[in-house]
Amino acid sequence: DVSHFRLSFHLLFAFIILSLIFWNYLDLIYLKQNERKLKNFLPEIFMILIFLQIIFGAFVSGMDAGKIYNTWPLMGNSYFPDDNKIINLFEFSALSDASLVQYLHRNIAYLIFILYITIAFTVYKNKIVILFKPILILGFVVFLQIFLGILTLLSGAGILISSLHQFSSILLITASLYFLYRNKFSF
């Protein structure tokens, strides 16, 4: 049995290394000119949420939290897990409570989805053509990840679907980095 904290720490560093390698790859294949397309910081906030979600995904995996509350969109009969209290979210021990970790993982996914829709709307509204391809790729991967996450829950965290969900997080990181890179540099 591995501590979910150690598992998430290990996974986080693996994703940081992957991110640095992929960012350097993008530097090698594209000519850069510093010019942000989206003037706000939504892409950076999106990236932070993705990394946070991966950490909570590791918590879910390490605690087998995906094997409880195998319903969606509710957790059992309510939005919040009925074996807990909302006040418990504000205690450090929440990170070791399987139902709260699953609750947080679900809700970070909802935030990511809402933020993606906001960013995509901004890209298309402002006709930022250079970001059309990256935002479409990112959208496909976001929807894939959400779909696989829901299937993982409904399957009781079956090994095949859970593995696909974990693998697609790699695609999500790379698609997010690609969008962030294309937003930051024009070529």
Please state what every model-predicted region is.
Residues 1-187:
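Polytopic transmembrane helical bundles with strong interfacial aromatic enrichment
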